[in-house]
């Protein structure tokens, strides 16, 4: 019985560690999208808009930049939702105090 219990504890520990690693990866991806990618896309959209105003860029460059920004926002939201799903999963499986 003791050996079975130890095996079960090792299995749960391995599952918990894998879940924590997956959560960390998902959170890192979300934070990077939010703090690095989105600001860069905003800057690009602002620069393309200014270039268009100065006559150095066409409307397609501006539209492409704003399309990329919109897609970046959607991607960041998807990543945030993934982190939230994983957090809920932790709460349901391991409890709130863990």
Regions found by a protein language model. Give the residues of each.
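Amphipathic alpha-helical coiled-coil segments
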Residues: 1-75, 79-93
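Short, solvent-exposed mixed-charge patches
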Residues: 96-98
């Amino acid at each position: 019985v003791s050996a079975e219990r130890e095996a079960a504890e090792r299995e749960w520990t391995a599952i918990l560690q894998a879940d924590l690693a997956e959560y960390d990866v998902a959170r890192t991806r979300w934070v990077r999208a939010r703090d690095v990618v989105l600001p860069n896309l905003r800057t690009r959209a602002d620069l393309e808009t200014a270039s268009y105003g100065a006559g150095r860029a066409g409307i397609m460059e501006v539209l492409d930049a704003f399309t990329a920004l919109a897609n970046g926002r959607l991607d960041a939201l998807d990543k945030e939702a993934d982190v939230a799903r994983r957090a809920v999963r932790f709460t349901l499986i391991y409890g709130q105090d863990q």
